[in-house]
From Swiss-Prot:
Signal peptide: none
InterPro entries, A to Z: Kazal_dom (IPR002350), Kazal_dom_sf (IPR036058), Prot_inh_Kazal-m (IPR001239), Prot_Inhib_GrowthFact_Antg (IPR050653)
Species of provenance: Lophiotoma albina
Pfam families: Kazal_2 (PF07648)
The protein, known as: Turripeptide OL11-like
Length: 45
């Protein structure tokens, strides 16, 4: 999981109920935690 994410703030709501600063951060977290986290919708949860 060598993903480098920008600090751009385009929040997305993950299927784990958490708001991520952008889709890259969600994808990176899913990879490092070995969980299947998907984007439920754009914006905060």
């Amino acid at each position: 999981c060598m993903t480098i994410c920008t600090m751009e703030y385009w929040p997305v709501c993950g299927s784990d109920g958490k708001t991520y600063p952008n889709k890259c951060h969600l994808t990176s977290t899913a990879c490092t935690s070995q969980k299947d986290i998907t984007v439920l919708h754009e914006g905060k949860c």
